[in-house]
UniProtKB/Swiss-Prot annotation:
Annotated gene: rfcS
Summary of subunit composition and partner proteins: Heteromultimer composed of small subunits (RfcS) and large subunits (RfcL).
NCBIfam families, A to Z: PRK00440.1 (NF001679)
Organism for this UniProt entry: Methanosarcina mazei (strain ATCC BAA-159 / DSM 3647 / Goe1 / Go1 / JCM 11833 / OCM 88)
Family: Belongs to the activator 1 small subunits family. RfcS subfamily.
Keywords on record: ATP-binding, DNA replication, Nucleotide-binding
Function, in words: Part of the RFC clamp loader complex which loads the PCNA sliding clamp onto DNA.
Lineage of producing organism: Archaea, Methanobacteriati, Methanobacteriota, Stenosarchaea group, Methanomicrobia
GO CC annotations, alphabetized: DNA replication factor C complex
One GO-annotated biological process of the protein: DNA repair
InterPro entries: AAA+_ATPase, ATPase_AAA_core, DNA_pol3_clamp-load_cplx_C, DNA_Rep/Repair_Clamp_Loader, P-loop_NTPase, Rep_factor-C_ssu_arc, Rep_factorC_C, RFC_lid
Identification of the protein by name: Replication factor C small subunit
Annotated S-S bridges: none
Amino acid sequence: MQAQMEDFKIKEEIWIEKYRPVRLNQVAGQEETIERLMSYVATKNLPHLLFSGPPGVGKTASAVSIAREIFGEDLWRENFTELNASDERGIDIVRNKIKNFAKTAPMGGAPFKIIFLDEADALTSDAQSALRRTMEKFSSNCRFILSCNYSSKIIEPIQSRCAVYRFRRLSDKAIRERLEYIAKEQDLSITDGGYEALIYVAQGDMRKAVNSLQAAAFIDVEKPISRETIYRTTATANPEEIKNLIETALRGNFRVARKELNRLLYEEGLSGEDIVGQIYRVVSEMDNLMILDLGLSERDIVGLVDIIGETDFRLTEGASEKIQLEALLAHFALSREE
């Protein structure tokens, strides 16, 4: 076992870095966006860019790949800098780090430098206003690539100066193909259930999928990575358990549902917010057969989603997980009698 662990450590580096795309055509699941970005690279005529979309869908990989392809492997690091706005939200990041890099000339005869500002929607309004002025002042020798989860949080004057690209959540197919490639490279054995669990946990986030796979690989060194291993290492309940919990409550068996809830909280160690999130996924994805079997109407589904949202809000405000989740199950149990 010791030898296997040593072999595992020799192989190991962070897989999201090891398997990060280095060329635009390696970015998964964003074909239309990548095609347009490649046209900028081909002409080396790059506007300011704004990448919008959820985490783990290729925004950072695309920005780095653009720099690699425009400047080449010898010069891209000298002409590219990456900053994270969530580390410093105020105006100082613009006045100091961004301006200091922007005002220096490009290296090696490059036409311009690139500043990649990740999580730009974390910047305050004042910082964004200062950034807008900096973009104008240094546009002759510097291009900005901004990345955000929500483009609505970026002020209009910045949006109007950028070509905006929206990165969508990755499809199950795109995630599975990438995971299968990594599994082959790492000589891993993964069951079909393991792949399904990774896709379920990831929710379209490639970074989360790869991190979850690496965590599971460290646990199941000697055997195929299974569905159970993925759920255990990611602190995720089996979707079937959540489905049974909901069905039990909706059929009026509150005590049984509460017992299962306590098992998930105290034996499995799941957080209240995670459980609420999974309950929402099951309710929102209920198929017609399940709805018919439980005798639910459209109005019932609307009511369930409403109370789930209220419970989620209360948990984020610091309310007791046990009380709020039991109240949620009680509402489910009573909903059939209303």
